Amino acid sequence: MNRFIIADATKCIGCRTCEVACAVSHHENQDCAALSPDEFISRIRVIKDHCWTTAVACHQCEDAPCANVCPVDAISREHGHIFVEQTRCIGCKSCMLACPFGAMEVVSSRKKARAIKCDLCWHRETGPACVEACPTKALQCMDVEKVQRHRLRQQPV
């Protein structure tokens, strides 16, 4: 089942708590104080306009453009999400250019460039850290069935 994170711009206050939670959950010690600026890598991004703020994350597309353009097949669907195999990634940025949502990022380090994106915190039993940390509950982890149920509740009788 295709799961993804959806952001409600009417609830987002732009606090970036989701970014911190994401970076910490993907760091080996999971300790905010232990993160250096080079290690602070969030897979979700808060974007701001003069009238609104919202979070942007991978939409876990069924026919993912990022996976389709990867020249080394480093991007595939695993564990119910689009996954980047870091050992295969060559950091070419093709995936970043192909993503219609701007959810792919290529991060350079001293060793090599690598593509990163939301993996729905597959390593956490409780689900995505950003969803859990959001103080206004602007983020939700959804699947197609949840979206359909939500739409049915919103339709007038």
Swiss-Prot record:
Binding site for [4Fe-4S] cluster 3: 58, 61, 66, 99
Binding positions for [4Fe-4S] cluster 2 per the UniProt entry: 22, 118, 121, 130
The keyword 4Fe-4S is assigned to this record: yes
Keyword tRNA-binding set for record: no
Residue ranges of every copy of the 4Fe-4S ferredoxin-type domain listed in the record: 2-32, 48-80, 80-109, 112-144
Keywords: 4Fe-4S, Electron transport, Iron, Iron-sulfur, Metal-binding, Repeat, Transport
CDD domains: HycB_like
Molecular-function GO terms, alphabetical: 4 iron, 4 sulfur cluster binding; electron transfer activity; metal ion binding
Binding positions for [4Fe-4S] cluster 1 per the UniProt entry: 12, 15, 18, 134
Protein name, entry field: Putative electron transport protein YsaA
The species this protein was found in: Escherichia coli (strain K12)
Classification of source organism: Bacteria, Pseudomonadati, Pseudomonadota, Gammaproteobacteria, Enterobacterales
